[in-house]
Amino acid sequence: MSRIAGTFAELKHNSRKALVTFITAGDPDLAATEALIPLLAESGADIVELGVPFSDPMADGPTIQLSSERALAAGTTLPKILDMVRRVRTRCQVPIVLMGYYNPILIHGLERFAADASAAGVDGVLLVDLPPEEAAEFKACADRHGLDVIFLLTPTSDEGRIRKVARQARGFVYYVSVTGVTGARSGVEASVSSNVAAIREAITVPVVVGFGISTPDQAAQVAASADGVVVGSAIVKLFERFTAAELGREVATFVSALREAIGN
């Protein structure tokens, strides 16, 4: 059983929902990311998504685009991210999912990336621009090295796409609650509950919901119908508002509030 599957099994046994937190690796620098991952886990995150910064983040809104720019300006690269994850693994076992775009992985080499990521302690990979129809080669590499490949479903996904994802899904499925790019929203789409229910009928792995969840109340609302919630832009926004000295405290406070809202 993968670390992600084990986490969801334990959560289900305890009637709890998963809190998945997103930060961009290398923002403001990799030393900060290395310190934040254990802090996120201690504050209540069950899974940590690490954004791999990319120069053309087409699925991301302004907050995460700026975060990627800061990380790239700090010299963040994929090999450096994997080295950082390897160091984190000496003191923290929270599941880590790399989230990003296909191009950096392709440049690194698919087989080499899967081997290097697994050796570093990465548990899963979500590539937002790699649909299941085009993922066979990468998924074969990931499967050989024990990496869960996470796929996206959206409000516009038809039954055919849902079936394709159901056949390939490992770890969990990420349901994008809104059309458009990442970023905080003022409310939760009314269709989330019914759409998630339909997906859960077709898919055996857990379904988590992300994009636009920015407050504890929204997280609680989504958690009522999903297996977990993903909060990203609202956390990354804190990086713009607070100094490096303040950041850890502010992130911990916010994540703890999210955890309390969806149930301890």
Curated annotation (Swiss-Prot):
Pathway: Amino-acid biosynthesis; L-tryptophan biosynthesis; L-tryptophan from chorismate: step 5/5. SUPFAM superfamilies: Ribulose-phoshate binding barrel. One of its GO terms (cellular component) is cytosol. It is an enzyme of class 4 (lyase). Keywords: Amino-acid biosynthesis, Aromatic amino acid biosynthesis, Lyase, Tryptophan biosynthesis. Pfam families: Trp_syntA (PF00290). PROSITE patterns: TRP_SYNTHASE_ALPHA. The active site is at 49 (proton acceptor), 60 (proton acceptor). It catalyses: (1S,2R)-1-C-(indol-3-yl)glycerol 3-phosphate + L-serine = D-glyceraldehyde 3-phosphate + L-tryptophan + H2O. One of its GO terms (biological process) is L-tryptophan biosynthetic process. It comes from the Bacteria. Its EC number is 4.2.1.20. One of its GO terms (molecular function) is tryptophan synthase activity. Tetramer of two alpha and two beta chains. Belongs to the TrpA family. The alpha subunit is responsible for the aldol cleavage of indoleglycerol phosphate to indole and glyceraldehyde 3-phosphate. HAMAP family: Trp_synth_alpha. This is Tryptophan synthase alpha chain. The lineage of its organism: Bacteria, Pseudomonadati, Thermodesulfobacteriota, Desulfuromonadia, Geobacterales.
